[in-house]
Amino acid sequence: MKEQNKNSAAVNELNTVPFKTKALPYCIVAPALIITIGIMIPFAMAIFYSLTNYSFRMPDYSMVWFRNWITILQSATFWKAILVTIKYAFFCIVLEMGLGMGIAILLNNLNNAFSKAMKVALIFPLMIAPVTATIIWQLMLSSSVGIVEKFLNLFGVYGFPWAASPDTAMLTVVMIDVWVNTPFCMLLILAGLQSLPKSPFESAKIDGGSTWFNFRNLTLPMLKPAMYIALLFRLMAALQEYAIVFSLTKGGPGDTLMNLSLTAYQTGFTFQKFGFALPYILVLWFVINKIAKFIVGKQRAAQRLAAGLEE
């Protein structure tokens, strides 16, 4: 009897709770649930259509199961797209991270009016769309009116092929990407530098530590969390690069710059083989997902190490 009274009291107490209080947990969870559903439904549809022969020209389609995947994995086009994607991402990341770190260290050490003016100037490429940046560089590299071409003429170099030659096309798009995205790496690394605690460096100075010793054993380990964040964002973007390459060469000359994104676009929208194009995108997603998990793990480990050094 007492147990029933307790249960009744608990039910009555629950019924007296205001509706807003009861609804609050559901309201908090709802946005995350909606976003998750919004992500999973297109992803599930992509997997499904990759197993079909779906085409925009023919609304009727049938299941081909893994035929698309097998054909693509046996195709030289796929493996060349993989190679182009990796090469492009590698060159971009090495240059952007290296230049971004060098510029960030320079600006952090200057810390004066010149440094502030440089920050404003360096942020400019981030303020324009990649397509706009590509158009600007097309004008700068033009053989007739380009300022870069005029500069090369001073050294006796005329008609440099830039994006017109398979030998220099990769160099050209990487150069534009580096110009556009190095400021992003610089800003993140500079923010990391300016957030470093001063006490470990003061202790090292008292102990007679050299500049190189401090950089290698203090600055770099404590800066790694910020560097991993910059690496993660830039690597994901470089692996799925589309705008700069398409705007400049549309993947040419020939198929020189046909990475996974452009190959998927060409297969799906130019050749109208939508089901055949999706495996390219899903492979790219899988690669980016695995790399992102690896970098996030490294970033967390670096955070723990940095916390230990700060103490």
Where would I find each of the regions flagged by the language model?
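Short, Lys/Arg-rich, polar N-terminal cytosolic tail immediately upstream
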Residues: 1-20
